[in-house]
A protein has these predicted regions:
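Short, intrinsically disordered N-terminal pre-domain segments
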Residues: 1-14, 159-160
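Trimeric beta-solenoid/beta-helix "fiber body" segments of extracellular/virion adhesins
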Residues: 15-75, 85-174
Length: 174
């Protein structure tokens, strides 16, 4: 590997860097000593500096990699986060960030945050979705295998099933 100092703030490497430690300490620490109210430190994943971006360009990925338990353990990307340009047009730039997780040996898109929608379970797998409130663990529950929605219940028996306490109104329509 060669390292070239391009400027006081820029170093050019001709290949990747591996940082290794033999314990659970951080392998990379970014420290900002700036004491103003601005954000710091900043990790910037930048693609093709000084080049025009294009629609559908992938901007970067963060991989969460570990070994499986095969006889000869294999590197598996168990989760990843990606960023992509949807529209590179000056003044109307759009992007999408996607979260992928390994499920049953296949990496699947779990969450997508795009310019016009947020999608959960784009891969249409049998995966439940649950929102808790302060007093209800199943305030909103989507049963991915049964294609049902529960409000106040984790076992909806119809397409939309609302369950309330004995003394409370379940649904109010004005």
């Amino acid at each position: 590997m060669s390292i070239t100092k391009v400027s006081p703030d820029l170093v050019d490497l001709d290949s990747g860097i591996t940082i290794t430690t033999a314990d659970n300490t951080a392998q990379l620490t970014l420290i900002s000593t700036d004491t103003d109210s601005g954000i710091g430190p900043v990790l910037d994943l930048k693609r093709n500096p000084n080049e025009a971006g294009a629609d559908a360009d992938w901007l970067g990925q963060i991989h969460f990699t570990g070994h499986n338990d095969a006889g000869t353990p294999e590197d598996i990307v168990y989760a990843k986060i990606t960023g992509q340009i949807d529209d590179a047009s000056d003044g109307s730039e759009d992007a999408t960030v996607r979260w992928y997780i390994m499920q049953g040996g296949t990496r699947r898109e779990s969450l997508s945050l795009g310019p016009s929608e947020t999608v959960i379970n784009e891969a249409s797998v049998d995966k439940n979705f649950r929102v808790e409130s302060d007093g209800n663990a199943n305030m909103l529950f989507v049963d991915g295998g049964e294609d049902r929605v529960g409000i106040g219940t984790a076992s909806p028996s119809t397409l939309l099933h609302a369950k309330g306490g004995s003394a409370s109104s379940i649904i109010r329509v004005d």
